[in-house]
UniProtKB/Swiss-Prot annotation:
SS bonds (residue pairs): none
Triple-helical region: annotated segments: 114-143, 162-185, 189-221, 226-252, 255-290
One GO cellular component, as annotated: extracellular region
Start-end of Pro residues biased regions: 194-203, 293-302
Region (Disordered): 79-103, 119-302
Molecular function per GO: structural constituent of cuticle
Protein's name according to its UniProt entry: Cuticle collagen 40
Entries under InterPro entries matching the protein: Col_cuticle_N, Collagen
Subunit record text: Collagen polypeptide chains are complexed within the cuticle by disulfide bonds and other types of covalent cross-links.
Superkingdom per UniProt: Eukaryota
Function statement: Nematode cuticles are composed largely of collagen-like proteins. The cuticle functions both as an exoskeleton and as a barrier to protect the worm from its environment.
UniProt entry tagged with the keyword Repeat: yes
Length: 302
């Protein structure tokens, strides 16, 4: 029962994994295809809007040129916010110069940015930089004279006394001292009791050889079987035996077929075939389009 549950769980996980992989693949392909298409569409929309905006600016500048020309003809001295011509981008057409009466002000660009302001206060000091690279070695000093001897000032090192070493081991025992002087003779004491017996003395020297003994009885010879010796080496092989009786007749049916043999070498390549008939003519191509051409610059409403 547990085995069946495990198999069912594995199948469900297999379907879930397949579904997840499919969704991931579709999402990846969608992102690969949709993002460039969306970017291309947004760029196309931006280009179209830019052309429309430039056209509107051009028409507006033309209207203001007519207005200034009318003021010049009528002799009207006026200055309004739009008296200063703005710089147009994308169109090189020059307009009529403004002929106002009291024009003493300076010109400015279309973005409305004035002259640069005063310099700001100095900023805080930056973090210290990294150490520079080591300099090149200096030039070699002049050689000393041959007869000059080194002095104590030539050596600039100081050798302080070293620390005390560890304590050494005990020395060997000294020789025994001289014998002491004889003690005083005891007075008033009698002889003491006898001491215990001393240890046995060392063995004495060996004695001399004794006289030869009488001859013994004559010996008797007894025969007993000895132990068997090791086996000898193997003898030479004997002559071949007589021929055996003929065997019984075999079955009349042939035996089973043997296994298939190895594949033979590849044959020589065949002769080249005859050339085929010419194919059918292809369908005519589609007419050329104007998708690559920019949209015409027309007035709004067309």
């Amino acid at each position: 029962m547990e085995e069946k549950q495990k198999i069912a769980e594995a199948e469900s996980l297999k379907k879930l994994a397949f579904f997840g992989i499919s969704v991931s693949t579709i999402a990846t392909l969608t992102a690969i295809i949709a993002v460039p298409m969306l970017y291309n569409y947004m760029q196309h929309v931006q280009s179209s809007l830019q052309n429309e905006v430039e056209f509107c600016k051009h028409r507006t500048d033309g209207l203001w040129d007519e207005f200034h020309r009318f003021e010049t003809v009528k002799g009207v001295d006026s200055r309004i916010k739009r008296d200063t011509r703005s710089r147009r981008g994308g169109y090189a057409e020059g307009g009529a110069a403004a002929g106002g009466g009291g024009g003493g002000g300076g010109s400015c660009c279309s973005c409305g940015i004035g002259a640069a302001g005063p310099a700001g206060a100095p900023g805080k000091d930056g973090a210290p930089g990294e150490d520079g690279k080591a300099g090149n070695p200096g030039t070699a000093g002049s050689d000393a004279e041959a007869a000059a001897a080194p002095t104590a000032s030539d050596f600039c090192f100081d050798c302080p006394p070293g620390p005390a070493g560890p304590a050494g081991g005990p020395g060997p025992a000294g020789p025994p001292g001289p014998a002491g002087a004889d003690g005083n003779t005891p007075s008033g004491g009698g002889e003491g009791p006898a001491g215990p017996p001393g240890p046995p003395g060392p063995a004495g020297n060996p004695g001399t050889d004794g006289a030869p003994g009488n001859p013994g009885a004559p010996g008797q010879v007894t025969e007993t079987p000895g132990t068997p010796g090791p086996a000898g080496a193997a003898g030479p092989p004997g002559p071949p035996g007589p021929a055996g009786n003929p065997g019984s007749a075999g079955a009349s049916e042939p035996g089973p077929a043997g296994p298939a043999g190895d594949a033979g070498p590849d044959g020589a390549p065949g002769n080249a075939g005859a050339p085929g008939a010419p194919g059918e003519a292809g369908a005519p191509g589609s007419g050329g389009g104007c998708d690559h051409c920019p949209p015409p610059r027309t007035a709004p409403g067309y």
